[in-house]
């Protein structure tokens, strides 16, 4: 017998600080874009935060007279959010596995500037152990700054052929 809707307890938020979220990513400084996981539910959604600093190297030349955070870096932050949710929903990457971006369709509608706190709300569209599709909305102060639909593929390095590194 299930509880009536009014008797169900709301799900507690699950969060991660910077130190813990780094354990889910292979990226290291200066390529870790996320600062915090605000909430997540495996197989369903993740909500992450990125604080944009005026000291970010990418802003030095983009643009000197009026700093605008590059959309390519926003896409990387979204990808990192997806990588974390993908692993939380399936399993951690094995030592010889990587995630590759399969496809991206994005639209950015407002500039992101130093001092902005960007919230990424990423929702799972479909999920398999080796493939993940998602949609994401990026906001600053509750206003949309961009939307993205994408996919990730989990691959073993051995499956990708000989490597030059």
Swiss-Prot record:
SUPFAM superfamilies: Thioesterase/thiol ester dehydrase-isomerase (SSF54637). It is an enzyme of class 4 (lyase). The active site is at residue 62. Keywords: Lyase. GO terms for molecular function: lyase activity. It comes from the Bacteria. Pfam families: FabA. Its EC number is 4.2.1.-. InterPro entries: FabA_FabZ, HotDog_dom_sf. Pathway: Phytotoxin biosynthesis; coronatine biosynthesis. Belongs to the thioester dehydratase family. This is Coronafacic acid dehydratase. It comes from Pseudomonas savastanoi pv. glycinea. The gene is cfa2.
């Amino acid at each position: 017998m299930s509880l009536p809707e009014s008797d169900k307890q709301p799900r507690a938020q699950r969060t991660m600080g910077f130190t813990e979220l780094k354990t889910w990513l292979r990226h290291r400084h200066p390529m870790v874009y996320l600062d915090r996981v605000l909430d997540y539910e495996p197989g369903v959604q993740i909500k992450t935060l990125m604080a944009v600093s005026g000291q970010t190297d990418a802003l030095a030349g983009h643009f000197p007279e009026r700093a605008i955070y590059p959309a390519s870096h926003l896409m990387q932050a979204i990808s990192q959010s997806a990588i974390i949710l993908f692993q939380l929903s399936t399993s951690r990457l094995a030592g010889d596995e990587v995630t590759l971006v399969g496809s991206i369709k994005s639209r950015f509608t407002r500039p992101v500037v130093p001092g902005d706190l960007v919230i990424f709300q990423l929702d799972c569209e479909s999920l398999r152990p080796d493939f993940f599709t998602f949609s994401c909305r990026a906001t600053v102060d509750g206003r949309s700054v961009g939307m993205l639909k994408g996919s990730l593929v989990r691959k073993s390095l051995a499956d990708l052929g000989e490597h030059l590194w």
